[in-house]
Amino acid sequence: MDLQLPRGTRDILPEEVSKWHFLESAFNKVCENYQYEEIRTPIFEHTELFERGVGDSTDIVSKEMYTFLDKGGRSLTLRPEGTASVVRAFVEHKLYGEVSQPIKMYYNEPMFRYERPQGGRQRQFTQMGIEALGSDDPSIDVEVISLAMEFFRKIGLTNIKLVINSLGDKESRLKHREALVAHFEPHIDEFCAECQVRLHKNPLRILDCKKDHDNPLIQSAPSILDFLNEESVAYFENVKKYLTALEIPFEIDPTMVRGLDYYNHTTFEIMSVEEGFGAKTTLCGGGRYHGLVKEFGGPDTPGIGFGIGVERILLALEKAEINIPETKPLEVYVITAQPEAELKAVTLVNKLRQNGISAEKDYLKRKLKAQLKDANRKKAIYTVILGEEELQTGNYQLKNMETGEQEAVSETTIIEKLTNTKEEK
């Protein structure tokens, strides 16, 4: 019997959770400042949702999904990405009928893909993301990008670069598609079997192929930017203009198509340029989509969003040697100098906690010296020592563990002192 972790998963142990809380808190605050509201969707959906939404020519749908039949014979899939589920919820709950548009949502949820596990990439991973539905104004494209850049600034990741592209509207993409087929078809036997299937199904996917990315034919492929019609050019120019106005530097990569079929117009990636982490490690990716809501049975509604892999961000922070703040410190450790003080320790710890003060005590009946060591290990700011004299007088020894200062004070004074200290901070 194998009782170890399944390959591609990991436990997040208590000493690591503070890092996750730090990222989650930073992301939530940035999203709320931009007026995005949280949405939570099911871990599994009907398989067809991802086949139609993500695209059956993508690696995600063709090779990476965790799909199973339930007891009723229905095909279900653990969600591999966030956008399809959010758009499904938008349609199912008729959020397109809301007076206040666009509808702006964020999520932070586990995703599942059957991939080869490696640094920053697991089979169960956590993705933070946002979706803005209901506006086709290029300024909201820039808002979405700006939000992502602000999140990275907030957590201290500044050694990054923004890369953008435009896939244009439907007309522009059809012309580009024809040019790609004409370019690749005479040499398609030089490509992998998957790319040969993609040629007439979705030739854009060839540009995104992991196996053939070094093939010179990909580098010499027709650029989408040469096929943008007047409307698409104007849209992309506005995106660039707004980014420049916000002083957000960017590069343009006409080969960047992203790994999903639903994108049009603006696509973007934010990459790490941290030495030793990989010059092209993508930390965030997203783009605009105009047909997804209609594909799911709703009205023709534009949208834009992005996804950020939390595990990859944690790895980037580690490589950049950025220290993540620790969790809320232990404020008081109550120490019992004799067994008779145990009852008072229990009630004092409880009262401190009820007053919003983090408190801890010994539960192993250790000696005074061992309790002090435990308080040090837990990085307690103060200790309260309960001995025979303290029980008789009702004044307890409150010790500042950093300065070593110690004073005899009442229970009420301890609570007032620590509460005032918290308010001053």
From Swiss-Prot:
It is found in: Cytoplasm. Its EC number is 6.1.1.21. It catalyses: tRNA(His) + L-histidine + ATP = L-histidyl-tRNA(His) + AMP + diphosphate + H(+). It holds the Pfam family HGTP_anticodon. This is Histidine--tRNA ligase. The keyword Signal does not apply. Homodimer. One of its GO terms (biological process) is histidyl-tRNA aminoacylation. It comes from Listeria innocua serovar 6a (strain ATCC BAA-680 / CLIP 11262). Belongs to the class-II aminoacyl-tRNA synthetase family. The keyword Nucleotide-binding applies. InterPro entries: aa-tRNA-synth_II, aa-tRNA-synth_II/BPL/LPL, Anticodon-bd, Anticodon-bd_dom_sf, His-tRNA-ligase, HisRS-like_core, HisRS/HisZ, HisRS_anticodon.
